[in-house]
Each structure stands twice: as C-alpha cells, then as structure tokens.
Amino acid sequence: MNMNTLKRTIALAALALLTGFAALAQRPTAATGASTVHGPEKGSLVIIGGGTVVPEIWDRFIDLAGGRDARIVVITNASGETDDFHNATITELQKRLGADRVTPMNLKNIVEANDPDLIAPITKATGIYFTGGRQWRISEVYLNTLAHQAMWDLLARGGVIAGSSAGASIQGSLLWRGDTAGPDILIGDHTQGLGFMKYTAIDQHILVRNRQHDLRDFINAAPMFIGIGIDESTAIEVHGDTFTVVGKSYVAVHFKGQDDFKFLRAGQKFDLCCRELIKTE
C-alpha cells in the first residue's frame, strides 16, 4: 500500500469511527455523566511501551495496587502460545509479592469471559496486568463481557490496570495495530479496545521501531481522539485526565491543531483535557 492510499484508508477509517462507533469510548454497560474526557474516572492506569519493564515502573504499579497487600491478575492472552512474555511478568511479580498474590488468567473465549466463577479473581484483585503479544487476542475474548465489566469495577474501587506493548494498546478505545494479519496494519479487523482511555489510540515501541509518526494522519482525521505513542522501558501513569511519564525514554502525544507530536520525558506531566504540558517547578 503506497503512502497516499494509506492516508486515505486512515482518513476513511477515522470518519467511520466518528460516525458509527460512539461506543468505542464507553464501557460494556452504558457510561453516562463521565467526569473525564480521556482518562479513567476512578482508579489508575500504567501503560507501558514494551521492552524491559524497568524497576521504577514495577514500583509504581505495585504501589498503586496496594503494595505488599496487592492482589494481581496477570492476563496472558496476548502472548498466544509464547511463554516468554507472561512467564517473565509472573516471575517478577511473584518475586516481589509472593506466589499467592499473583493469579495468571488466560480465558479461551467469550463464554469463559462471561462465567462468574472463572472471572472471580478479577473481582477480588487490586491490580490487573496485560502481557505483550497481539492485542486483538485480548479484544476477541474479553471485550464487552462480564470480565470486561469486572475490570471497570476494579477501577471504580480504586484499583490499577497496567499492561505492556499489546497490553498498552488494548487500553485505548481504538485498537491500534489490531489486525489479525499483522501489526503493520494500523486499523484492521479488530478496531475496539477495552476503552479505559476514552477517545484514545495508543501505540508502543515507537522509537525502537520508528513508529513515532504513525498516529498523525489518524488524529488529523479524527480530532476528538488523542494519540499516545510510548517507547520501550517507558510508561505513562494515568490518573483522571492527567498522566506522568515514568521510565527511561520518551512518550509522543498527538492531537489535532499541532504541526507534529509533543515529546515528553520521565517526570513530565500532561493534561489530556487541555492537551498541554503541565508546568512544574
């Protein structure tokens, strides 16, 4: 596909989303009276751009989940048959919290994701972590199910949802790189994320894989959306409509009305509602 065709495809997809997918920004049961524009109304998110998860990111996730009292569910669907992603995550969390505080979950289909007994660990958890891999595998099983609603309930009681790589993109309302054919298709056959970030598309590995410009055309065609690209070993910690950058590299923020993206580094804060850097002394 040449660049002009790609741009037209993105523009048409954006218009379709704006006119036909209002539900992209909503939870499984209709959300009304939202107090935030993009971020979660309650609870917090830790959205990681892939690669090695550095200690300061783990520290923030565990602190937000309750410290030594945290109860974590690790959802491994994105990894498919590959053990590397989820084994390393489970090992790290068990080392920090103990094996009894960490529950792996890999539900096989929508039927299982609607089974109250199988999703019970989410209802008791203080934190959820999505491993990397392919984000459509998460959407295909959990979207608009009782498990999905249980994730919203976790946020409502002040919990935290984290994820790396595919586990980052799934947290947006638009599922970026969600095609089953491969991650080079930006908007594909799975378009809806879990929506913890409303009117948002999230990309990952942006500098390592030279993806920092990929969100631009979509955001220009869909001005109500914001695009967030996160590099490896870097995360954003989201509370309401504010996020803080954590880690060793950069975050790119795309929104309508700017010539290019804004780059943020560790410690910098961004107002998602006003779409501007928060100045700190």
What are the residue ranges of the model-derived segments?
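N-terminal secretory signal peptides that target proteins for export/translocation
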Residues: 1-6
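Bacterial N-terminal signal peptides
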Residues: 11-22
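Catalytic nucleophile loop
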Residues: 129-132, 151-175
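Catalytic-core regions built around general acid/base machinery
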Residues: 121-124, 146-158
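ATP/NTP phosphate-donor binding region
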Residues: 62, 70-120
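C-terminal and late-domain segments of enzyme folds
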Residues: 26-69, 83-88, 93-97, 175-281
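Glycine/threonine-rich flexible loop motifs
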Residues: 135-145
